[in-house]
Amino acid sequence: MADLRDEKGNPIHLTDTQGNPIVDLTDEHGNPMYLTGVVSSTPQHKESTTSDIAEHPTSTVGETHPAAAPAGAGAATAATATGVSAGTGATTTGQQHHGSLEEHLRRSGSSSSSSSEDDGQGGRRKKSIKEKIKEKFGSGKHKDEQTPATATTTGPATTDQPHEKKGILEKIKDKLPGHHNHNHP
């Protein structure tokens, strides 16, 4: 088998997940596969260690092609073998990459707990811890939007004192088990 080297000149060993050498490189249907654009048998040193994706946002990382080589080219063509990925941790099986990098990095808008929110200008801004706590315990309302809580009591009449709003720390302490704050005047 030819000596394979990465872009920094380090040897690349073609092995399976158990460390056994790969003799014949095939896809899931048994067809021989070859990988182009990622591995070469001669070391190529670049000025930059960044990938070509930054320079060409719509370029493909590597393309795989089913075998079209003559039958005796087994060991020689293993130098461009599938199973060696371009740093993504995945192997390809005859599919070409179509579309830009942004399409693959797009995320869904639904999230159960978000640490950022819309800034109103098409971007995102990071929530503060105070905002997260208010959202969790204070139902996420602003101070001017909160409705005062009314308590109905049955039993002996109490003195009519104006009800003070609980601070955020008191609300948190009330939610914690065993830390109920009963120091109300």
Curated annotation (Swiss-Prot):
Compositionally biased tracts (Low complexity): 67-94, 147-159
One of the record's GO molecular function terms: metal ion binding
Database matches in InterPro entries: Dehydrin (IPR000167), Dehydrin_CS (IPR030513)
Basic and acidic residues bias locations: 1-10, 44-55, 130-146, 161-177
Superkingdom of origin: Eukaryota
GO cellular component: cytosol
One Pfam family from the record: Dehydrin
An individual GO BP term: response to cold
Segments of this protein annotated with the region Disordered: 1-185
PROSITE patterns the record matches: DEHYDRIN_1 (PS00315), DEHYDRIN_2 (PS00823)
PANTHER family, A to Z: DEHYDRIN LEA-RELATED (PTHR33346:SF5), DEHYDRIN XERO 2-RELATED (PTHR33346)
Family affiliation: Belongs to the plant dehydrin family.
Protein name in the entry: Probable dehydrin LEA
The organism's taxonomic lineage, starting at the top: Eukaryota, Viridiplantae, Streptophyta, Embryophyta, Tracheophyta
Gene that encodes it: LEA
